[in-house]
Amino acid sequence: MPTAPEPPWRGRREETSRQPLTRYAIVEAALRVLDREGIGGLSMRKLAQELDVGAASLYWHVRDKEELLGLLLDRIVGEGSVPDPDPENWREQVKEMGRENRRLLQSHRDAAQISLGRIPIGPHSVPVLERNLALLRASGLPPRVIALAADMFALFVGGFAFEESMDSSEPADTDQLAEYFRSLPPEDFPTLHALADDLVAGDRDERFEFAIELLVRGLEAMADDD
């Protein structure tokens, strides 16, 4: 897979032979800290300790923690595997794109949280973006629809993966919630009462598959109307 140049706003300084650090080494070390301690434990000071260097030396390569998080997201998304587009099989390929992006955000601790509000742009993620867009383009949909669909998939998968990473929904909680819905007066809350069990049924995988099926069928309807 080809690499893309760094975006111009990252203000990278030229590295010289006198500098023992590289941006690559910093990002790899940051990924180790992230996996071990999460985003809350990732700081420039902790990263310097991981690399056994002074914190000030990091700023030659990385402006601040915000830029570091952007570099981490670029690195994580760059691990993605995207097939060549097949116009005859674009629907299943787009579904698999959603599954792969979910897997990527599950593969490193707090990766989903890092993805929120950030667009992965960098030498590792841009080739993945190109190939993901090519899968959507194989549908034959208009360019504007492709762009909006890509954004919608990213928003959905990122939000879904972030909710998964919180891991706050225990089985007992869903049982209690269903019991609460069933206890509501049916004359006042007929729909909640009727859907009490269905509202909490299904695991995360089932809900994820339903959502990407819904998104792809929407695109399919647009393709048929075009």
Specify the residue positions occupied by each region the protein language model found:
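Helix-turn-helix
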Residues: 25, 29, 33-67, 71
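Short glycine/proline-rich, acidic loop/turn segments that cap or connect secondary-structure elements
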Residues: 179-194
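Hydrophobic alpha-helical bundle segments that form small-molecule/ligand-binding pockets
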Residues: 128-152, 156-181, 200, 219-222, ...
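Amphipathic alpha-helical segments used for helix-helix packing
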Residues: 73, 102-131, 162, 166, ...
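N-terminal intrinsically disordered/low-complexity leader segments
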Residues: 1-21, 190-198
